[in-house]
Regions:
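Domain-level signature for soluble enzymes in the chorismate/prephenate branch of the shikimate pathway
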Residues: 1-203
Length: 203
């Protein structure tokens, strides 16, 4: 395992590739399991972090989604949750600096890792087509990861929201066939949206 002091030193040194590799090697191996753990993540049902929580803790858990990354850390600090699930890196943009900053600020411990394949889909309410869409919503990372696809639709107005699944929820609640979201296929199922294009982050 690795001490809290060592983790803090890695965080302070920065979120470059070398230090992220050290973080990956440094996950605490002496984790004491909590019975019926309370688990929080950033996002809405259908978020990739929710899927990560289910991958790591099991499919029968009931993780609670929170609005912001820092809300996850605050919930643990205040004793309202036992574990928080946050993204450390993605293949497109590398290490996520905000998470490193929060780990350093709250002096929390990493206890494990899991990998979630990211396949973004373009989805919209029933009746929508690529021709009806004028606005597309996602987390800023989702928009960035789908840049090549979005460049083929230069007239679409791109609007970042707090998370990918929240974008699906917003579009579903609007019922507007001019609006589309980029997020996971599971989010489309949860919020009743039709998938128009799969794998838009692979374009």
């Amino acid at each position: 395992g690795i001490s809290r002091r060592q983790q803090r030193e890695i965080v302070r040194e920065g979120a470059d590739d070398r230090n992220f590799a050290r973080f990956q090697r440094a996950y605490e191996s002496r984790r004491q399991p909590v019975q019926n753990p309370r688990i929080v993540y950033q996002g809405c049902p259908g978020a990739y972090s929710e899927q990560a929580a289910r991958n790591f803790f099991g499919p029968d858990i009931a993780p609670i989604g929170l609005r912001h990354f820092e809300d996850v850390f605050v919930a643990i600090k205040e004793g309202k949750a036992d574990y928080g699930v946050v993204p450390i890196e993605n293949n497109s943009t590398g290490a996520i600096r905000q998470i490193y900053d929060l780990l350093s600020h709250y002096e929390f411990y990493l206890v494990g890792e899991t990998t979630v394949p990211v396949e973004h889909c373009l989805m919209a309410p029933a009746g929508a087509t690529l021709d009806t869409i004028t606005h597309v919503y996602s987390h800023e990372q989702g928009l960035f990861q789908s840049e090549k696809f979005l460049n083929t639709h230069p007239d679409w107005i791109q609007t970042p929201l707090a998370d990918t699944a929240g974008s699906a929820k917003y579009v579903a609640e609007s019922g507007d066939i001019t609006k589309a979201a980029i997020c996971s296929a599971r989010a489309a199922e949860i919020y009743g949206l039709n998938i128009l294009v799969t794998g838009v982050n692979y374009s």
